[in-house]
Amino acid sequence: MSWQAYTDNLIGTGKVDKAVIYSRAGDAVWATSGGLSLQPNEIGEIVQGFDNPAGLQSNGLHIQGQKFMLLRADDRSIYGRHDAEGVVCVRTKQTVIIAHYPPTVQAGEATKIVEQLADYLIGVQY
């Protein structure tokens, strides 16, 4: 399966409206769906946040110029929320998956499908 198919499948669930897969270092976009693109400083703060969430804790995270309040940050997952919409960022061995969900979707529903994709990729050494 191509990387594009993974982001398209996330959108196809109806639980996510935008998704992007970056290299683990955040220096290359491998696939994007729904028009999600991040500025270099935005992906940079997310990639750094997996190892040291202090910056995200004090400043939030930014996706397409929008500030999201940090809900969770550890070495695998970063969750953020802005009003009723949110983002789920998950790091695997070789990728960073970032997905945005709209106000009509519950956070837990979006989180579950993104984390499941990450589990699959980790299981196949990605």
Swiss-Prot record:
A Pfam match: Profilin
GO biological process: intracellular transport; mitotic actomyosin contractile ring assembly; positive regulation of formin-nucleated actin cable assembly
SMART domains assigned to the protein according to its UniProt record, in alphabetical order: PROF
InterPro entries, per the entry: PFN (IPR048278), PFN_euk (IPR005455), PFN_sf (IPR036140), Profilin_CS (IPR027310)
Family classification: Belongs to the profilin family.
Binding partners and assembly: Occurs in many kinds of cells as a complex with monomeric actin in a 1:1 ratio.
Protein name in UniProt: Profilin
Species per Swiss-Prot/TrEMBL record: Saccharomyces cerevisiae (strain ATCC 204508 / S288c)
Taxonomic classification: Eukaryota, Fungi, Dikarya, Ascomycota, Saccharomycotina
Gene: PFY1
